[in-house]
A protein has these predicted regions:
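12-transmembrane solute porter fold
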Residues: 1-9, 26, 233-399
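Extracytoplasmic
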Residues: 1-31, 35-37, 90-91, 261-265
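Central cavity-lining transmembrane alpha-helices of secondary-active solute carriers
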Residues: 26-42, 88-95, 284-297
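Symmetry-related core transmembrane helices of the 12-TM Major Facilitator Superfamily/SLC fold
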Residues: 141-159, 179-188, 208-215, 405-416, ...
């Protein structure tokens, strides 16, 4: 049910605010999730299960009520941080509960497959559930719908769960809350730099410079404090494990490639002018692919297939989907044309996500598993924000470049240009007069050029991402051979 917290897309469309603002609100929440995972196990062990769920759900309802009653962006930002804390407290407890119910030698792996299937498909599912409320009523009513779902969770907890503990009770003392605060400030400031950097011309703006400095200062304070305390929240020793390093790198690259999917939905809305409720339905093509990908990689993982083949084929599928998107970026595309790459992209992300997590977790000693999982969550935080920043900057730069190129090709001696201009003038002259009609016609041509520039830019972006996917695939399959060759060449000098 914590997945219902994350959907702010329709709030953005109703309030007409910038994409950067929505991304930053999500990043505030996700940064709070990363920080709370440091102390989640202590909090979960302190309470009995039913009491814990009732408490977190009740507080989540109060937070949602607060969000529905305010329009102050600063206050909403604070509430999003608090919401992120209770989001993970509410959601993360279901993983150990699920593991206990699965009678299998690999219950943890199966439980993770369930969890990440919901995480990858949750935004589309929750969007569909909230669609009717936002269409017929408003964004406050949308939040109330989320609130009602939490009431259902409370009813389930009261009726079906007992009040036993899953393990030994740990008292809530010696919690290193100062380190949590340092990390939260560092993540929030770092996310601000990545998300708003292009908008404010990076370090030409004092706000960006200050946030970058705060990111470095509080990040350093967190690291220093963790090195000094006897019982650190995060053990940096896990960075010595090969699985963690490789898994983190692959996870980061996975999120860079995956971040381009938002561009597809943006083109659907701004260029092809598809209704947003129709775009929601189209996303189910991607959901079906994701479920198929999760099931396929899960079958291979339970059969102990080498991670090299799972990762290699996963990035091959992602790269192929990027190449298949390229020819769909035309003004007259159809759902049948865009459906295939959407489906294949879903297979790729579903195929890779859980195996990457399991690869990181199984590569460390059992007492470091929690920190390894936190590394994966942190990489998702940075991967999402870096991917957003990269795609935003690439889209902006390429759009400007292609717009200028297209504008330069307009020639008043070209019959096509003359006919198009005359058609627009005839359309608007009878309504507005010659002078206003000329302005509207110029604006219409500018809008058409912007749309064409956007389509060409996306062709270029997806081509580069497809090449990246293929390069990663090649490196995965060749890494073992290259490492062996390197060691052989190095042996005479050792």
């Amino acid at each position: 049910m914590s997945l219902f917290h994350s959907n702010t897309a329709f709030t953005a469309s109703t309030l007409d605010i910038e994409a950067e603002d929505i991304q930053y609100f999500l990043s505030l929440m996700y940064g709070a999730i990363v920080v709370t995972l440091l102390i989640f196990q202590r909090l979960f062990s302190f309470f009995r299960v039913r009491t814990y769920i009732l408490l977190t759900c009740s507080l989540s309802i109060l937070i949602l009520l607060g969000i529905s009653l305010t329009r102050d962006p600063f206050l909403i930002g604070i509430l999003r941080v608090i919401e992120g804390i209770f989001c993970v407290l509410e959601g993360a407890c279901f993983l150990p509960l699920l593991m206990m119910q699965i009678k299998h030698t690999k219950s943890r792996t199966i439980a993770y497959f369930f969890l990440y299937t919901f995480m990858l498909t949750g935004s589309t599912l929750t969007t569909s559930l909230l669609k009717e409320s936002i269409m017929d009523y408003g964004w406050q009513d949308m939040i109330h719908v989320v609130l009602y779902w939490h009431l259902i969770v409370i009813a389930i907890a009261l009726l079906l769960l007992n009040n036993n503990r899953l393990g030994k009770k740990f008292p809530l003392y010696q919690l290193d809350l100062a380190s949590c605060l340092f990390l939260l400030i560092s993540l929030s400031c770092g996310a601000y730099v990545l998300i708003y950097g292009r908008k404010y011309y990076w370090f030409e703006c004092s706000t960006i410079t200050i946030n970058f400095a705060l990111f470095l200062i509080f990040g350093s304070l967190f690291i220093i404090k963790q090195r000094m305390v006897k019982r650190p929240l995060f053990h940096f020793e896990i960075l010595r494990y090969q699985n963690v390093i490789f898994g983190v790198i692959l996870f980061f690259l996975f999120y860079i490639i995956r971040s381009c999917l938002n561009n597809v939905y943006t083109v659907m809305a701004t260029v092809w002018k598809w209704p947003w409720h129709y775009i929601v339905d189209v996303q189910y093509i991607n959901v079906l692919g994701t479920i198929l990908g999760v099931g396929s990689s899960g079958f291979l993982l339970l059969r102990d297939v080498s991670p090299k083949y799972i990762f290699g084929f996963g990035f091959l599928i992602l790269g192929t989907s990027c190449f298949l998107f390229v020819p769909t970026f035309y003004p007259d595309t159809t759902i049948w044309a865009i459906g295939l790459p959407l489906f294949i992209q879903g297979i790729g992300q579903g195929w890779l996500f859980t195996p990457l997590v399991i690869y990181i977790l199984t590569g460390v000693e059992s007492h470091h598993a929690g920190n390894a999982g936190l590394m994966g969550t942190t990489v998702r935080f940075w991967g999402t924000n870096v991917g957003f920043a990269l795609i935003q900057n690439a889209s902006y730069t390429l759009n400007q470049k292609h717009y200028i190129q297209l504008e330069q090709t307009l020639n008043t001696n070209n019959p096509l240009t003359i006919n198009y201009w005359n058609t627009l003038m005839e359309k608007y002259t009878g309504i507005y007069g010659d002078q206003i009609a000329g302005r509207i016609a110029s604006k219409s041509i500018s809008g058409t050029l912007s749309q064409q520039a956007s389509l060409i830019s996306n062709m270029e972006i997806f081509t580069y991402l497809g090449i990246l996917g293929m390069l990663i695939t090649g490196l995965i399959f060749l890494f073992g051979s290259a490492k062996t060759l390197f060691m052989r060449l190095r042996m005479p000098y050792l």
